[in-house]
């Protein structure tokens, strides 16, 4: 296997996450602008003006850029849909991710590459064959197992099922991140409860709440093991990514456009390393254990294998929010970087910072820097800790920009 045959696709909801993904070695990024994307409400979406800047950054870095246009589209949305795809064409975005045939057809008409969204729930080779007239990359349903994926891949190869560009259709699958309790994300709970449609990018995440179960006739509350009965654990595939590669998956999609840059960086880096390791023969239990430990440090609701290995019932989280082994605490902001010395000046605005603390620095150009504090200087003197109100300097291995944010990682207490 050649590592260049595979692609890590990173989620991007901010410039910090964009630069973090690029730094981690992502091959492509996906993002949304304003409306018509499945994270229109939950992530900090970009504007049409951002589209051109993101496309330029990605081209300069050799990274593909994918724009999501994958919500349910009504007649009154057609003009907006066309204007968004027109902007994608002008910005030279690599492809759009679509689920509505209207978006696919229009993109094809004006020469914009199309990739298919998980919202289509493509679960068999014949459905893929039909949609191949529109798309060069197809994401398969998250409910499939690896035997089913392999069958679809073998059909593509045997029948030479090609997309509009004339190349065999590439299979994309989710590799890591949040899962929906509904099939391929087609959920109506949010619409029913809050008149806020998940299928229009406005999911209120009410499945993540805790619930009690009562007998309607007797009024008795049932004793259930877990109150989070509709909130799945997060998908993690790094311990069997070799099986996915062997089954024909070529694009590995990471969920998390609403997550921070440290999440994007850590997850992308781990999966990139795993793919490279399998290709060069160093994929083993020791490496998997190291990646598992790193993945546990960033946002997660606990992990499971999804349905990929044949499991038919979901696994549900036992908590609300993140179960990461550590949390980031805001400490201060960047003031100046002294490149010759490799030292950054920060203003401490909250809490304390100690020698030995692990920190993360984030910014729209910086992306993310993760390192330990080896030395702290305050008024030219070495000190053991820094406190609120002080301007301090610490060695930093990369350039820090004014107003970059400084966080301290703390161990999360259960």
Swiss-Prot record:
InterPro entries: Peptidase_U32, RNA/ubiquinone_mod_enzymes, Transl_B-barrel_sf. Pfam families: Peptidase_U32. One of its GO terms (biological process) is proteolysis. Keywords: Hydrolase, Protease, Virulence. Its EC number is 3.4.-.-. Its cofactor is a metal cation. GO terms for molecular function: peptidase activity. PROSITE patterns: PEPTIDASE_U32. Homodimer. Belongs to the peptidase U32 family. Has collagenase activity. Hydrolyzes type I collagen. May play a role in virulence. This is Collagenase. It comes from Porphyromonas gingivalis (strain ATCC BAA-308 / W83). The gene is prtC.
